[in-house]
A protein has these predicted regions:
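Mid-domain alpha/beta scaffold segments of enzyme catalytic cores
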Residues: 1-258
Length: 258
């Protein structure tokens, strides 16, 4: 019973084979998935998929690489789509200083606004941060985390940074990057954080874990992330899967609906 808390089954790479991907995931014990939409086409597809499959949920928001296109019309669109009963979070939102498709001040403004929306709507928010960890921290700290909390998606910082984010009310999510040989900082985080503060994800079709590194990632491969982190922590894969699934269901508000 594994919950992939961040996958992009809604992108073109998976078009026409979503059922196959969901079936393979089930074979490997991945029984719930959070489909993340980050622009209009992927948001629309995410909502179509969650309507079709009981075990799928959606997170929708405006990605930092799209921050330059955020308008009042886009915000109205998001507010409408966020009403969908299977939307469990707002995201992925944040800062991306790697691609810099929008100026820092524009990214910051859009990030802050969407954090505010998440709190207004009583939803957790999901954060994308790349080459921008310190600024991301300062913005979350100044805006504050609502009672539903937030998720640091595909975390790639140190234990010190992870603990700072956890103190703000965030939960740390690990993608296949944790399995990479040189990812020693991330492995330390996955080993040392309290069990109730961690989640697992794929970010499929990106960031495939070892032993599939370099290939297309698939939501089924959350299994490899679970296996790796459970070994790090000296516990069984079943124990880690149960704990991270319970964490996801709590954050997404699914524990009260079951």
């Amino acid at each position: 019973m594994i919950f992939d808390t961040h996958t992009h089954l809604n992108v073109e790479e998976f078009a026409g084979r979503e059922a196959e991907e969901i079936a393979l995931a089930a074979e490997m014990g991945v029984t719930q998935m959070n489909i993340v939409g980050f622009d209009q086409p992927t948001i629309e597809r995410a909502l179509e998929l969650v309507d079709e499959y009981d075990q799928l949920y959606a997170t929708i928001g405006w990605h930092p690489t799209e921050a330059g296109t955020y308008t009042e019309e886009i915000e109205a669109y998001l507010l409408d789509k966020l009403k969908h009963p299977k939307v469990v979070a707002l995201g992925e939102i944040g800062l991306d200083y790697h691609w810099m498709t929008a100026p820092k001040e524009v990214q910051e403004q859009v990030f802050r606004r969407q954090i505010q929306l998440s709190k207004d709507l009583d939803l957790p928010f999901v954060v994308h941060t790349r080459d921008a960890l310190e600024d991301t921290y300062e913005i979350i700290k100044s805006e504050g985390v609502g009672p539903r909390g937030g998720i640091m998606h595909s975390f790639s910082g140190t234990l010190e940074w992870a603990e700072k984010f956890v103190e703000l009310g965030m939960t740390i999510s690990f993608s296949g990057v944790v399995t990479f040989k040189k990812a020693t900082d991330i492995q330390e985080v996955a080993k040392e954080l309290p069990l109730d503060k961690i989640l697992v994800e794929t970010d499929a079709p990106y960031l495939a874990p070892v032993p599939k590194r370099g290939r297309e990632n698939r939501t089924a491969y959350t299994r490899y992330v679970v296996d790796f982190i459970s070994d790090l922590r000296g516990m069984t894969a079943e124990e880690l899967a149960a704990a991270t699934t319970a964490n996801a269901e709590r954050i997404f508000g699914l524990d009260s609906k079951q």
